[in-house]
Structure formats: C-alpha cells, structure tokens
From Swiss-Prot:
GO terms for molecular function: acetyl-CoA carboxylase activity; ATP binding; carboxyl- or carbamoyltransferase activity. Component of the acetyl coenzyme A carboxylase (ACC) complex. First, biotin carboxylase catalyzes the carboxylation of biotin on its carrier protein (BCCP) and then the CO(2) group is transferred by the carboxyltransferase to acetyl-CoA to form malonyl-CoA. Residues 39-293 form the CoA carboxyltransferase C-terminal domain. The keyword Membrane does not apply. Keywords: ATP-binding, Cytoplasm, Fatty acid biosynthesis, Fatty acid metabolism, Lipid biosynthesis, Lipid metabolism, Nucleotide-binding, Transferase. It is found in: Cytoplasm. One of its GO terms (biological process) is malonyl-CoA biosynthetic process. Belongs to the AccA family. One of its GO terms (cellular component) is acetyl-CoA carboxylase complex. The lineage of its organism: Bacteria, Pseudomonadati, Pseudomonadota, Betaproteobacteria, Burkholderiales. This is Acetyl-coenzyme A carboxylase carboxyl transferase subunit alpha. The keyword Nucleus does not apply. Its EC number is 2.1.3.15. The gene is accA. Pathway: Lipid metabolism; malonyl-CoA biosynthesis; malonyl-CoA from acetyl-CoA: step 1/1. It comes from Cupriavidus taiwanensis (strain DSM 17343 / BCRC 17206 / CCUG 44338 / CIP 107171 / LMG 19424 / R1).
C-alpha cells in the first residue's frame, strides 16, 4: 500500500519519491547505486524523526485522522484470536460504526468493542464514518453486560469524530444511550481497558472509554470537540483550527500531564500507519501489562478503585484569597 503523506510531511514525500525513482533505475541498470539509496533512506529516516519530534497539536490531529491509520478490526486481527463478532442492540438495529465480539487475548477469553471507520467510499458510508447512532452505543452496552455476566475482561478501542448528530439519532435518544453506557461502565464487575487509537471525539468516544485503564496511542487525540468545531464557535471560522487544537490540549502528552489518561503507547517512526504489525505488537504488550494489574483483584476492590478514579477527575484545590 502506497503511503499517503500529509502536508507537513512533503519534504519526506519528496525524498521517498527520489528513493523509489533510484530503485527503479537500479533494477534496469548495471550501475550500482545502492549506496546512494541507503544514504537517502537514512536521510529520510532522520528527517522523519526531526519532523515528528516537533509536531504541533494540529499536526497530531491530522495524523490521528490519517486515512491509512489502523482501525479497530486491524488490531483485532493482529492482537486477538478466535474473534467472533456479535451484532445488534436487540432494540432497533445493528450499527456497523461500532463492532464488538468475543475473542481470546493471550489465550484468555475477553470481549472486544471498538469504533470502526472505513477505507473506501462504500465502507465509510456503511460505517457512517465511525460516528455511532444510539443503536451502536446500545450494542456496546449489551456486549459489556454480557462480558460482565460471564466475567470477561473488556478491551475497547476508540476512534470516532463523535456521536452522529443527525435528527434520527436524536429522536432515538442519543444522549440517553451515551449516558446509560457511562452508568453501566462505572458499575462493571470486570476490568475495562480503553485505548484511544485515533480520534477521541467528545461523548461519542467517552461512551466506550470509562475504563480502569485509559491509554492513548502517541499520535491519537481526545477532546470535547473537534478543532474545526471549536474554531467555528470561538472564532466563527474553521480556519482557526490550528489555534483551537492548541487550546483544546488534545494530545496524549498533554492529557497525561493533566491526569486524564494513564498511559501513552509509543508509535513506530512516522506513525501507526507506517507499520501495522509493529504498532500492534507495542499495543499488545501494553494491554497485557494493563490487564495483569487486575489479576487476583476482587470485584469489591476493582469497583472501589474505579470509584476513586472517577471521583478524582476535576478535583481542585482552594487557596487563600490574595490581597
């Protein structure tokens, strides 16, 4: 699959194009230019390191939305075995923007739930661009309750611009569905490990992300609104999205500093879309470490830990009035 380069990656794209051109020439020539190819490859790698070491929040948001970034089903294929997808909310319909089912993680039975976008126009429409309707969240709730009943740990993967804002979704109780999920997750008797793998868009993301461990991939984002939406409200123009991204503090490192997430999972050089298997291996290791800390923990201890965790959000300290 040919790599799609973002605007700020154009210097890398030009180098990679030159390397491909030289490889093509080498195949049709008796002249050995392997040293030049190696030199340019090293230069490209160093340039990628330099660019990715100084990303702005807006550039991180672009990476989180990269069309070639791994989605939930990509991680399911690489990390889990014996995945059996379960469908429908048993109330209205089967929302394909959320997928879920039974699987095995390192041989242990578990439940996997996640947002799913699409690769081409047809699949994106089928998946509603990763924006769930109420039936999607109710499907997720049904699967969480099923996992709770059988004592299965839950892994969720978050990647959505947000909950679908259409009239039909509102008519069927979008906010109620999200709120009910938050209630259910808070009381689960099994561990829930949530991973933000791409976009973490507002309540649409939170609806499957009230976890005992919340982790983010290095170039994922998590915020109450998209940069464009924030800019449109504050500055009346989406062109201010870069400034909005800065103000939102949507990057993994910023959220970790604020105590809103627990872990950051490093990505391969150039982002997760450059190396699916490498990214999956890093994520699998992190998931195993997260799950291990709940071994031997009683339900009472697990729920008490989660309760304390939830109450810790938004704490503030009072200071004496200044003269």
């Amino acid at each position: 699959m040919k790599t799609t380069f973002l605007d700020f990656e154009q210097p890398i794209a030009e180098l990679e194009a030159k390397i491909e051109e030289l490889r093509f020439v080498q195949d049709d020539s008796a002249v050995d230019i392997s040293e030049e190819i190696s030199r340019l490859a090293g230069k490209s790698q160093q340039l990628t390191k330099d660019i990715y070491a100084n990303l702005t929040p807006w550039q991180v948001a672009q990476i989180a939305r990269h069309p070639q970034r791994p989605y939930t089903l990509d991680y399911v294929r690489e990390i889990f075995t014996d995945f059996h997808e379960l469908h429908g909310d048993r109330t209205f319909a089967d929302d394909l923007s959320i997928i879920g089912g039974l699987a095995r993680f390192n041989g242990q039975s578990c439940m996997v739930i996640g947002h799913q976008k699409g690769r081409d126009t047809k699949e994106r429409a089928m998946r509603n661009f990763g924006m769930p309707k109420p039936e999607g969240y109710r499907k997720a709730k049904r699967l969480m309750e099923l996992a709770d009943k059988f004592g299965l740990p839950i892994f969720t993967f978050v990647d959505t611009p947000g909950a679908f804002p259409g009239i039909d979704a509102e008519e069927r109780g979008q906010s109620e569905a999200i709120g009910h999920n938050l209630y259910v997750m808070a009381g689960l008797r099994v561990p829930l490990i949530a991973t933000i793998i791409g976009e973490g868009g507002s309540g649409g993301a939170l609806a499957i992300a009230v976890g005992d461990v919340v982790q983010m991939l290095q170039f994922a984002t998590y915020a109450v609104i998209s940069p464009e939406g924030c800019a449109s409200i504050l500055w009346k123009t989406a062109e201010k999205a870069p400034e909005a991204a800065e103000a939102l503090g949507l990057t993994a490192h910023r959220l970790k500093a604020l105590g809103l997430i627990d872990k950051i999972v490093s990505e391969p050089l150039g982002g997760a879309h450059r190396d699916y298997k490498g990214m999956a291996a890093l994520l699998k290791r992190s998931l195993a470490e997260s799950l291990r800390q709940f071994q031997g923990m009683s339900v009472k201890e697990l729920q008490a830990r989660r309760y304390e965790r939830l109450l810790a959000y938004g704490k503030f300290k009072e200071t004496g009035a200044q003269d």
